Swiss-Prot record:
Catalysed conversion reaction: Cleavage of hydrophobic, N-terminal signal or leader sequences from secreted and periplasmic proteins
Known EC number: 3.4.21.89
Protein name: Signal peptidase complex catalytic subunit SEC11A
Membrane topology qualifier: Single-pass type II membrane protein
GO MF annotation: an example: serine-type endopeptidase activity
Keywords annotated in UniProt: Endoplasmic reticulum, Hydrolase, Membrane, Protease, Signal-anchor, Transmembrane, Transmembrane helix
Active site location: S56 (charge relay system), H96 (charge relay system), D122 (charge relay system)
Task of the protein: Catalytic component of the signal peptidase complex (SPC) which catalyzes the cleavage of N-terminal signal sequences from nascent proteins as they are translocated into the lumen of the endoplasmic reticulum. Specifically cleaves N-terminal signal peptides that contain a hydrophobic alpha-helix (h-region) shorter than 18-20 amino acids.
Source organism: Rattus norvegicus
Length: 179
């Protein structure tokens, strides 16, 4: 049985080995965080990787697709570009396409978005009284994607017990593989 074998392995470990395994797990977690921060610096985006959570961008992107983002300040936003934006009062960013751009005489640019699979533009999603998005609302712009790889993230959000199981299995893997 897996659980009994695992417990026997843990019991056979001396304190030094157990301490080493805990440190090893800590190194894995801290390495992942450093890689994330590095990606943030390189891409200029607060969230360089996002998962598509709905079918609003089909057929371009499907639920569970993993998007790679950049957010260079100097690059102008263009019609047809896919952006990830955050709306005040909503925790989760939205992935949609730029539908229209509105440029004022002073050079200030605002834009309107829409999901490819939606019948109407996103004005109904914006906060009340807001009709356009601004560059400050953009988290990033889609530069590439990997299909369906983010479905694990969706499962972890939809089923919290699944996320605990994944974390437990990762911890178990680190403890059992001592090399």
């Amino acid at each position: 049985m897996l659980s009994l074998d695992f417990l026997d392995d843990v019991r056979r470990m001396n304190k030094r080995q157990l301490y080493y395994q805990v440190l090893n797990f800590g190194m894995i977690v801290s390495s992942a965080l450093m890689i994330w921060k590095g990606l943030m610096l390189i891409t200029g985006s607060e969230s360089p990787i996002v998962v598509v959570l709905s079918g609003s961008m089909e057929p371009a992107f499907h639920r569970g697709d993993l998007l790679f983002l950049t957010n260079r300040v100097e690059d102008p936003i263009r019609v047809g570009e896919i952006v990830v934006f955050r709306i005040e009062g909503r925790e989760i960013p939205i992935v949609h396409r730029v539908l229209k751009i509105h440029e004022k005489q002073d050079g200030h640019i605002k834009f309107l978005t829409k999901g490819d699979n939606n019948a109407v533009d996103d004005r109904g999603l914006y906060k009340q009284g807001q009709h356009w998005l601004e560059k400050k609302d953009v988290v990033g712009r889609a530069r590439g994607f990997v299909p369906y790889i983010g479905i694990v993230t969706i499962l972890m959000n939809d089923y919290p017990k699944f996320s605990y199981a994944v974390l437990f299995l990762l911890g178990l893997f680190v403890l059992v593989h001592r090399e």
